Each structure stands twice: as structure tokens, then as C-alpha cells.
Regions:
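N-terminal secretory signal peptides that target proteins for export/translocation
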Residues: 1-7
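Short Fe-S-cluster ligation motifs
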Residues: 69-101, 105
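Electrostatic cytochrome c docking/interface patches
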Residues: 22-37, 52-53
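C-terminal capping alpha-helices of c-type cytochrome domains
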Residues: 93-135
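Short cysteine/histidine-rich zinc-coordinating motifs and their immediately flanking basic loops
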Residues: 54-61
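Detector for the c-type heme attachment site
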Residues: 44-51, 69, 122
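The canonical Cys-X-X-Cys-His
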Residues: 38-49, 117
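Bacterial N-terminal signal peptides
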Residues: 11-20
Length: 135
């Protein structure tokens, strides 16, 4: 029994689309690297500048999503106002001499690090299954 040509073509096209969509799936963030970045870089800075850490379990998931979407880190004007800036190579360059994690992650992809930190904040928020502090 021979399959009509259009069925073979349709199946082939479907296979290509499925394979392509799986290969191009969005980067969802690496929890381990997000945890490392937040605890070693973000917390160190918060401790120095504010005198206290800002633990992920201090806010709800929705609060962290709103914070990330607003992209407002420092409203005082004392530092860069963008949240995203603090996961960039430009920022890591400025602290690499005093922060080994920043030096280690110096050439990491900025967008992926940003996603890693977001994933860690969601994973360890107050209303998550794994609320976590800064230790």
C-alpha cells in the first residue's frame, strides 16, 4: 500500500516543525547559577550598600515578577536604576576585583544570567514550594 505524496510531505513538514520548535525553545534559567549569582553578587552588594540582605523569601512570586517587569532597581539615584544592568558584563567588570563570583561569571551571557536570577527568585519566593533566604 502506497501513501499518497501529500501525506508523506505533510508528515515530513510536521516532523521538521516539531524538531525545530524543540531546538529553539526559550531559555528558562539555571537555578544553580541563579542561586550562585544572587547569593554571591546581589546579596554582597545589598549587604554593603543597604547594610542588610534582601532574601528572595521576603517577597511573593508576583512581587518579584512586578519588580523585574518594572526594571527599577535603585530609586535613590545612587546607582544604576535598571535591574537588568546588574546582570550585565559591564557591571561584573566593575566588581570583578572584589567579587570572585563576578570574575568567574565575567563572560557569561547577560540574558541567560538575567533569566537565571529570575528563575531563582521565583523558585525561592515566599509563596513558592522552596522559600529561601540569602545564606
Amino acid at each position: 500500500m502506497r501513501l499518497p505524496v501529500y501525506r508523506v510531505v505533510r508528515f515530513s513538514l510536521f516532523s521538521v516543525l516539531v524538531t525545530t520548535s524543540l531546538a529553539v525553545s526559550a531559555y528558562e534559567g539555571d537555578l544553580k547559577r541563579g542561586r550562585l549569582y544572587f547569593r554571591q553578587i546581589c546579596t554582597a552588594c545589598h549587604q554593603t550598600v543597604l547594610g542588610k540582605p534582601i532574601p528572595p523569601n521576603e517577597r511573593l512570586k508576583a512581587d518579584w515578577v512586578g519588580y523585574i517587569k518594572a526594571d527599577k532597581h535603585d530609586k535613590t539615584g545612587k546607582s544604576n536604576p535598571s535591574v537588568k544592568y546588574f546582570t550585565t558584563k559591564a557591571y561584573r567588570e566593575t566588581i570583578k576585583g572584589s567579587n570572585k563570583a563576578a570574575e568567574k561569571l565575567l563572560n557569561a551571557n547577560d540574558a541567560e544570567l538575567y533569566a537565571d536570577v529570575q528563575a531563582w527568585l521565583q523558585y525561592s519566593a515566599k509563596d513558592s514550594d522552596n522559600p529561601s533566604g540569602c545564606q
